[in-house]
UniProtKB/Swiss-Prot annotation:
Disulfide bond positions: 47-63, 54-68, 62-78, 70-76
InterPro entries: Beta/delta-agatoxin_fam (IPR016328)
Protein name per its UniProtKB record: U2-hexatoxin-Hi1a
Keywords: Disulfide bond, Ion channel impairing toxin, Knottin, Neurotoxin, Secreted, Signal, Toxin, Voltage-gated sodium channel impairing toxin
PROSITE patterns documented for this protein: MU_AGATOXIN
Any GO CC annotation of this UniProt entry: extracellular region
Signal peptide positions (record): 1-23
Family under the similarity heading: Belongs to the neurotoxin 07 (Beta/delta-agtx) family.
Lineage: Eukaryota, Metazoa, Ecdysozoa, Arthropoda, Chelicerata
Major localisation: secreted
Subcellular location: Secreted
Amino acid sequence: MRNTTFLVLNVMLLVSVALFCAADPEMEKSSFAEILDTGNPEQERKCLAEAADCSPWSGDSCCKPYLCSCIFFYPCSCRPKGW
């Protein structure tokens, strides 16, 4: 039983590392800290004017004064802060 649990946890860890490494190529263009601080300007251009849509990489700048809310990255939508 211990071996099975250990194997399952190792597989889950490997899959999560593989998904992280295969992240969107847009992320390689700037440092992660810069994206967290300022948002990715290339993604911000893709925001809808009425701020009904956002992406996990654009941050809340698309949604002002709302927050960008995502369920497992997609679909993302702008929602009031209380949600």
